[in-house]
From Swiss-Prot:
GO CC term (a single one): chloroplast thylakoid
Native species: Arabidopsis thaliana
Subunit-level organization: Interacts with CHIP and FTSH5. Heterohexamers with FTSH1, FTSH5 and FTSH8. May also form homooligomers.
Protein name stated in the entry: ATP-dependent zinc metalloprotease FTSH 2, chloroplastic
Organismal lineage: Eukaryota, Viridiplantae, Streptophyta, Embryophyta, Tracheophyta
Required cofactor names: Zn(2+)
Amino acid sequence: MAASSACLVGNGLSVNTTTKQRLSKHFSGRQTSFSSVIRTSKVNVVKASLDGKKKQEGRRDFLKILLGNAGVGLVASGKANADEQGVSSSRMSYSRFLEYLDKDRVNKVDLYENGTIAIVEAVSPELGNRVERVRVQLPGLSQELLQKLRAKNIDFAAHNAQEDQGSVLFNLIGNLAFPALLIGGLFLLSRRSGGGMGGPGGPGNPLQFGQSKAKFQMEPNTGVTFDDVAGVDEAKQDFMEVVEFLKKPERFTAVGAKIPKGVLLIGPPGTGKTLLAKAIAGEAGVPFFSISGSEFVEMFVGVGASRVRDLFKKAKENAPCIVFVDEIDAVGRQRGTGIGGGNDEREQTLNQLLTEMDGFEGNTGVIVVAATNRADILDSALLRPGRFDRQVSVDVPDVKGRTDILKVHAGNKKFDNDVSLEIIAMRTPGFSGADLANLLNEAAILAGRRARTSISSKEIDDSIDRIVAGMEGTVMTDGKSKSLVAYHEVGHAVCGTLTPGHDAVQKVTLIPRGQARGLTWFIPSDDPTLISKQQLFARIVGGLGGRAAEEIIFGDSEVTTGAVGDLQQITGLARQMVTTFGMSDIGPWSLMDSSAQSDVIMRMMARNSMSEKLAEDIDSAVKKLSDSAYEIALSHIKNNREAMDKLVEVLLEKETIGGDEFRAILSEFTEIPPENRVPSSTTTTPASAPTPAAV
């Protein structure tokens, strides 16, 4: 026999042995053997202790092997038993039995039920002369049949049914043993795996479906404090009061103040809502529960409401504490939209959440902190005082906030002397805290890839381009396509610069990024939340500049699909001017509910609530805005053909033109509107908000 070796690791020891073992067991007259060869050698200490998780995995592996061996044994036993008994469930007619008897194919006959049933052991030619056991229904035990059996010298015997009850019971137990063992083993596996496939309360343990999945930290060690949170000073101030109340409640109760029951964080993604919650846990030093809103909802009815009850029960037992619910819009969506019916699982869960929050007694010390970026779809009952007493807006930071955030994330990075965090903050309007962290991380990755010891301005520039527009592609070779893209991008820049109120050009490039073969970058205004009608209309003109350049330079038949992204943007902007901002001939009306802006179903319902005449007026107003902007773009291209040709010539040569160089060349041929003139020092490097040409 070939030798094999096995290495056993357990209780911190690595053991090798040299002994042979052989195990054997008889199953119904058949012998099944299991052999293993183990070599013995030296004992070496590998580890002082074994991790609990490895122990548990070892038990599960052992249980799986045990179940597998038991299954093999039972199958082997059943097969051997079946080979002995044959196919006793097969039936044979009485006439065929007599035919077999005449041809000497019957070996044995067992009679049951007073001779009315016979189990016959016969040789079947259809099965290659195999011996099979068949059941024959006899008309009665006749003397002629007995005499025939004696004459053929066939072994036959009569049996009482009571005598066979033991074997029937044994066969029944044998048939049920394997399923019972399998089910029991699976149950033990699910128990030992801590709740089965779904974890505690998951599908593996049905008894824990209604238990909360919230992560509980008695002494939270998130590693985050308010010093790590920058750019959201107003939100920090509100939460500092909450932390003070949890630490020193007597200071507030002495003057009759009550603890706020809930704080709702509202803001776009990446602005630091979850980071603020971690900072609260780190500062307060009280028990901290964290859970996602989606974990309340399951496929089974009532599970979500049960988990809400279980969560708040644990919170009250550990008060004072903080309960953080991330993405609460998953469970707090507005009710009564007609979607899912009155018994929708989300509505039941929301009803239970409202009840639990409103059922708190005064000053219990339990504060619910929730975060969402879809406050417009939350149920109004969830937002009233007494539930979420405070609503804190966490918006994208301003220049000062961006500078503070960059200082936090730049603490562990090395920069060249020419890198200024203040300049980076000025160049990144609209960036959230997560975007700024990603920006510096991308710059550090690029510096490492280029074998640099510190981050330079070049890495910062490339990182901004990469985050906003995507990965850099291969530059196009000279040809008609490259010339067309150059005219397209210069058309954007010229129409934008010559239209009063438009953002300043940052750079024009033919270097492809993402899906765009060329890009025109503009500097957004300092306050992106306040935009005038003139600025919006100028952006529509600038967006149509690429399409206008293609039509004027190459002819109407040569217009390409490169303006598809531009058309989508300017159509959406024009529709917003008409339906949301009231900047059209229809009048200062808000024709679209704010909650319908980000919800497809609500948008459809709002559209259906309009009259046909009003819908036609909206479409006409949108078309009028787009048509008038396109006429202006066409006139800019026609009146500045020489400037266009010169700019395209320089762009094809350099592949990238900076904003200052672009305006210097353009001003040689035409006058730039005073409001669009920009000091040269403000546009030395690219910023955000590109206008792509997806040719």
